[in-house]
Amino acid sequence: MTEIEACIKTVRTPYRRLFVFPSRIVAQGWLRQSLSLLGVRTVPGRLCLSWDEFKKRCFQCAPCAHRTPISEPLRLLFAHSVVQRNARQAAEGRALFCNLIPPAYAQDGAVFVQWLARILPQLGSWQRRVESHCMPPKDAVSRNTFDGRDARAYAQSAEAQDLQTLKAHYEQFLRAHALFEPSWDTPQFCAQGNTYVIVYPQLMQDFAEYAPVLQEAARATAGVLTFLPVPPFRQDTPLCCFSNVREEITAVALQVERLLRTGTPVSQIAVSVANLEELQPYVEREFRLRDIEPEVRAGFCLGAHPAGRMFSQLREFVRSHGTLKSVRALLLNPHIRWADPQGAQAVVQYGLQQACIRSWKQSGTYCNVWLQAFALHCERTEQERQHQQCAQRFFLTLLRFARALVEARSFVRMQKAYGAFRAACLLPASAHTSGAEEEIASSAFASCSAGEDDAVMARCVCVLQELAALERRFAHVVPPDPYSFFVQQLAQQMYVPVRAGVGLAIFPYRVAAAAPFLHHFVINVSHEASSVRYQRGTFLRADVRAAFGFEDEDVTEAFLSAYATAQTVYFSCSVQAFSGVQRPNRFFSNVHPPVSSTLTGRASQTPSPAGIASETGGAVPQYPAVRYEEDALQAEQDLYAQGAPVPSSLYRTQQERLRKAASLIPAAGRSYIRDSFAQALPPLTAVLHARHFHHAAVKVSQTDLNLFFRCPAAWFLERVLDVAPLSRRPRLVDPRVLGVFSHVVLERLYNRIACEDECFFSAHMERYRLWTQEAIEQVFSERAVRAGPLVWALRAA
C-alpha cells in the first residue's frame, strides 16, 4: 500500500480532510480510487483537489478586496500600449527604455511585447529581492550573493532603471482601472474549516511562492496542513533501452495489447510520453494499427489546430494580396466548411490555369493578380466560361468579407465582420453540439465545423468576444493592429478537448505523475526529454539571477519517483530518436536492453525477470517476453519478405486493407494497356487518323518515338487522348501553352516570309523582327493565350 492510499483510508465523514494533488488529472484519478479505498459508493468532489483549485479556494488577497485580478490578454494589451508610447517618445529623443528595448529598435518594438508581458508578473518579486539586498546586513556574516554595495550599483544600472520604469507604468495602469497583479501581493491562507494534505509539493511549479504562507499557517494551527513529500527515487529502477524509438513504441503497443488480452481494463492503463509533440503521430498510429484506440489527454494551441489556423490564413490571404500559395492554403484546408466548396475548388484550379502566382506593385499601388486574370476573359468554351464565373463569384465574395475582417480597426468591428464573413462564406453552424458549446454554436458568431473543429472554432470566437469586452472597458490600450493581436492570442491560448474516456489514455510527460493507474508506461525517458527544471527570473542574466536568489530547481528525480509510485510502471527510452542520438536519464543506474528480441520480430530468447519492488509497494518490472506470433504486423511483413507462414490472426486494419486490395483486382477481360485498339473504337480510330496520319502515311517525330519506345501506354495517353498529369505547382507560364504559342508565331512568320520574300534574306532582319512582333500581337488577341495576367502585364510594358 502506498503512502497516499494509507492517508486516504484514514478519512472519515464528514470528509473535512481534503487532499491536494499536483494536477487535475491526478486529483480525478485518486477521487475515483478513493471509492474503493473507503468502501463507499459516493464521496464529495472536493475530497481531491488540484493545486490550482486549492489556490482559488484557499488564498485571498485582502488588500485587493475591491479590485479584480488582471488577465493575461490585458497584460498583453498593456505591453502593446507601453511599446507604442516608447516608440513615440523615442522619435522625439526621450525613449522610456534604453536597455529593455534598445533605441535603435524602438520603432519595431512589437517583437518585445510578448517578452514584456511575461516580465510583468515577476516584477514584484524582483523589486523585493533588490530592496532586501540593498539593505545593510544585520550581522557581520557575508552574503553568498551581492553585498549591499553591488546591489546598490545594480539598482542604478540601465536594466534596473528600465524595469523600475516598466513597473511604475504598470502600477499606474492597475490603479487607474481598479486592478491588481496577483503575483505581487502576499496571499492570505483561509482553511475554510478543513484540513489539507498537500501531496508531492515538489512537483508544483509555483509552490515555492506560497510555501512561506503555508508554513506559517501550519505553525499557527496544528494539523491544518500536512505535507506529503515525494519518496526517494531508487536509482536501481530498471530502464529498458531500445536501439531506436520505433522499436520502443512498438514494444509498448505490444505490451498494452497483451494486458488488454489478459483482461486488464483500458481505464487502468496509461502511457506518458516525454516530448509528446514529436512522437504523438507515431504513437497514435502504432496503437491504431493494433486496434487500440488512443485518447491523447493533451492540450494544444488554438492557432495550431487546422480549424483555428483559418484566422492566420485569412490574414496571409489579405495582406499578401492573394498569392496563390495563401489562396491554396486557405481554400484547401479540409477543416473549413465553405458554403460553396465547388467555388473554392474552382478558384484554386483557375489560379493554376491562369498562373495567378502573386500580385505586383505598379505606380505605387498593388494590382491584384486575380482581378487582372478575371478581366482577361481567356475562356474559349461555355464550360470554361461557367468555371470562370464560379471562381470569380466565390473569390470576390471571399475577398470582400475577408478584407473587412482582417482590416477592422477594433475588436468590436472584428466581431461584427466575422459574423458577416461566416454568413456569407461558411456553412451554418453544426447542429451536433453539446454542453456549454451549444449556446456558442447557436450564436451569430458560431463556427461552421463539426466535432472537434466546431469546438475549436467556438473557442476562437470566445477569445474574440473576450477581447471585444476588454475593448469596451480599456479602449485606450487597443493595439493598432487588432487582428494580428487576435491571431497572437490564438497562438498562445491552450485548449484541452473533452475526451470520452473510453480509449487508452496518453499523457504528456509530468501531467499524470503519481496518478493511480494499474499499469503506467513512461516512454522516451531520455536525459534531454525527461529533465524538468523550474526557472524563475528568466528575464535576468544568469549571474544576476543567482545573486538575487532566483535559483533553478531541478525536479527531474522527483517526477521519476512520483511515476515509480504506481502499482506497475514501465520506464523505457531509445538510443536513436527522430531528432538524433540521445542518452538515458542520468538518475537510472540499471539500464538494460529489451529482454525479448521478439519486440522487433525475431525469435524469443529468455523470459523477463520478475522486476524490482518499489519502497512504496508497487513494482517496476522489465518488459516481459512477447511471443512472435502475437505480432500480426511483423508476421505479415515476414510473410512477404521471407516467405514465413501466414499469420493465424489479423488486426482489423489488416483485414480492411486486404478487402480493399481484393476489390481493386480487375476481372479477367480486355486490357486497355496491352491489347490493341485497332478498329476497336471507331471514334478513337478517327482521332488517330486526324492527329497522326497524313492521308495514308503516319506522321512520326523524334519526340513521339522517344516517348513510344519508353512507354507505349504513356504515348497513347499523352499523344492520342491528350491526357496530361495534373500539377498543383504554380507556373508563371505553362510549358505546353508556351510551346504551342511559339509554334503558331513561327508558323505565321515563315509563311509570310515565303509569301513576300520567297526565301530568307538576312538583310531583311529588321523587317522580320517587326513581323514577329505583329504575329505575337495577333496570337495574343486571336487565341486568347492562357499566359496569365503577369505575362500580359509584361507584354503591355
UniProtKB/Swiss-Prot annotation:
Pfam families given in the database record: PDDEXK_1
Superkingdom of source: Bacteria
Name of this protein: Uncharacterized protein TP_0900
Record organism: Treponema pallidum (strain Nichols)
